[in-house]
């Protein structure tokens, strides 16, 4: 057993998990449960009353966090300590949304001035492009942006841009390319005019396979459509640490934006990786996005554990994963603009906490990162909600909804809200056999048929959920929401004693993929790998089954 599972608090939680009454009873016995188990901060309201929890549960979970030295680990992250121990790096995405007055030291120097310089450089660039001052090789202003990245360099900008569609004020169009599948970029290029298109290449090394391949394809298209090598600088910019490779490609050094080792890809949208966002919503709105995230940072760093929104959400996720064998967690966004958030949170959580050894290399004997999935309401109610209500797996849920719509048409939003709240009630309350029989009492079915149908209509309830509300979806509230989930992810990793900031599984896939690519291009059939891999490579080389 690990130190964590040997602790008396862990053992107490394991025993306590079998003693909690059904949530129906918890609500019936405590009229103040909603007010006692809800919290408002940074423009967000969290109702966590529909969880399998009593005051004793919360006390035990907070004790577990204290024993794991969560407070000290939070301070260490904000202080710039080397908490990404396997890569010997600080973790300071929070510095990207710091204020100019702060001082944050990494690798012996204050990094805030460089962050502010980059924001100012982004401001100048955005103004140049959106004002029409930036011209393409034929003298025309830019109309379309193509953002080329992968992972965090793709998901963050794409999903935030999608979420903030009501704030697109610059008149530009933006297209996102990530997958190395040639169809992805080909379909985008068909829509574009090379004279008015600007490409943003985002890769720390300027060598990420998918990103470099897509960028080279974009350059070849540009040259084939009338551009010259000397014109590349007018149509390509880069966010990278490798200035030499970017300039060799043809990008002007003045149009290269920095990336830092103390920012992981899945936490990078707050940096120059967010250029596509800024080009669509303007820098004032981009700074509001940063402001909302900074407010959540301040809350996370200073609020007591019992009143700390990311801590509460992180502890409940751990509670269900480790003591109720919950293998997945669903995120349900009741706002069309937020439909991409489940995919973003999926990468954030699963790439961070999909680990199986502790910081000292001991194999864990408890579950770590769950599968994160989800979609937008009300679509999911006609698909996978059936599994949530009557399936035999426990799947905790987060419901996210703005109280006010950007498009208040008729009763649309009232119906959306009623569905959202109705689903959380149904998951908690369920339907008993007696209730199902009562609903069938006036039907013409026989008693035997009524009983049979009633059994099929029973729903156990007691399915946990959080509900997150905001007044309205704005850059500021979105920034706070994303930072909330970043810190929620950190809380779990800190208690599990794992490194939430490396991704060696991703790195292995990259290296093996490169090896397979070499074998695909070889003159002779593959024979050196396992039989399955050899067979698949050789079938691919033949081009037919």
From Swiss-Prot:
EC number(s) on file:
5.3.1.9
GO CC terms in record: cytosol
Which pathway does the protein contribute to?
A: Carbohydrate biosynthesis; gluconeogenesis; Carbohydrate degradation; glycolysis; D-glyceraldehyde 3-phosphate and glycerone phosphate from D-glucose: step 2/4
TM region positions: none
Q: Which SUPFAM superfamilies match?
A: SIS domain
Q: Which compartments does it reside in?
A: Cytoplasm
Q: Does the keyword Cytoplasm apply?
A: yes
The record, for Pfam families, names: PGI
Catalytic residue positions? 351 (proton donor), 382, 510
Provide the alphabetized UniProt keywords.
Answer: Cytoplasm, Gluconeogenesis, Glycolysis, Isomerase
Catalytic reaction annotation: alpha-D-glucose 6-phosphate = beta-D-fructose 6-phosphate
- EC supergroup of this enzyme: isomerase
**Single GO biological process annotation from the record:** gluconeogenesis
Q: Which GO terms describe its molecular function?
A: carbohydrate derivative binding; glucose-6-phosphate isomerase activity; monosaccharide binding
Q: Known NCBIfam families for this protein?
A: PRK00179.1
Function (record text): Catalyzes the reversible isomerization of glucose-6-phosphate to fructose-6-phosphate.
Which family is annotated? Belongs to the GPI family.
**Protein name as annotated:** Glucose-6-phosphate isomerase
| Lineage of origin | Bacteria, Pseudomonadati, Pseudomonadota, Gammaproteobacteria, Alteromonadales
State the gene name recorded for this protein. Answer: pgi
């Amino acid at each position: 057993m690990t130190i964590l599972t040997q602790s008396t608090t862990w053992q107490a939680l394991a025993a306590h998990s079998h003693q909690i009454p059904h949530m129906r009873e918890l609500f019936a016995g405590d009229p103040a449960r909603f007010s006692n188990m809800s919290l408002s901060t940074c423009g967000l309201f969290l109702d966590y009353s529909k969880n399998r929890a009593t005051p004793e549960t919360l006390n035990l979970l907070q004790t577990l966090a204290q024993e794991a030295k969560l407070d000290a680990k939070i301070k260490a992250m904000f202080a710039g300590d080397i908490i990404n121990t396997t890569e010997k790096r600080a973790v300071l995405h929070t510095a990207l949304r710091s204020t100019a007055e702060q001082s944050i030291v990494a690798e012996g120097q204050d990094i805030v001035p460089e962050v502010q310089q980059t924001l100012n450089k982004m401001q100048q660039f955005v103004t140049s492009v959106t004002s029409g001052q930036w011209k393409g090789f034929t003298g025309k202003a830019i109309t379309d942006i193509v953002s080329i990245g992968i992972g965090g360099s793709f998901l963050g900008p794409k999903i935030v841009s999608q979420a903030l569609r009501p704030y697109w004020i610059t008149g530009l169009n933006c297209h996102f390319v990530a997958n190395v599948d040639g169809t992805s970029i080909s379909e985008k290029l068909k829509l574009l005019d090379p004279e008015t298109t600007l490409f943003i290449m985002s890769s720390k090394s300027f060598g990420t396979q998918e990103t470099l391949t897509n960028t080279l394809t974009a350059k070849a298209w540009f040259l084939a459509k009338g551009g010259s090598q000397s014109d590349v600088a007018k149509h390509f910019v880069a966010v990278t640490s490798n200035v030499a490779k970017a300039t060799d490609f043809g990008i002007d050094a003045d149009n290269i934006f920095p990336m830092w080792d103390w920012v992981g890809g899945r936490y990078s949208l707050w940096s120059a990786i967010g250029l596509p966002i800024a080009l669509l919503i303007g820098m004032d709105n981009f700074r509001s996005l940063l402001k909302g995230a900074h407010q959540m940072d301040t809350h996370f760093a200073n609020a007591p554990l019992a009143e700390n929104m990311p801590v509460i959400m992180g502890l409940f996720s751990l509670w269900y994963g480790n003591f109720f064998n919950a293998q997945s967690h669903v995120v349900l966004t009741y706002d069309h603009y937020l439909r991409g958030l489940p995919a973003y949170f999926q990468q954030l959580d699963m790439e961070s906490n999909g680990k199986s050894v502790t910081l000292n290399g001991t194999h864990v004997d408890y579950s770590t990162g769950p599968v994160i999935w989800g979609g937008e309401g009300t679509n999911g109610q006609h698909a996978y909600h059936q599994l949530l209500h009557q399936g035999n797996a426990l799947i905790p849920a987060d419901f996210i909804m703005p109280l006010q719509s950007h498009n208040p048409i008729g009763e649309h939003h009232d119906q959306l809200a009623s569905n959202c709240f109705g689903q959380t009630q149904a998951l908690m309350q369920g339907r008993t056999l007696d209730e199902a029989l009562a609903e069938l009492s006036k039907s013409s079915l026989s008693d035997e048929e009524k009983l049979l149908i009633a059994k099929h209509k029973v729903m156990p309830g007691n399915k946990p959920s959080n509900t997150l509300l905001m007044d309205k979806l704005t850059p500021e509230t979105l920034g706070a929401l994303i930072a909330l989930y970043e810190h929620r992810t950190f809380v779990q990793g800190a208690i599990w004693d794992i490194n939430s900031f490396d991704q060696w599984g991703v790195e292995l896939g990259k290296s093996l993929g490169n090896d397979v690519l070499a074998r695909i291009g070889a003159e002779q059939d593959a024979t050196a790998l396992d039989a399955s891999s050899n067979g698949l490579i050789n079938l691919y080389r033949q081009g037919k089954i």
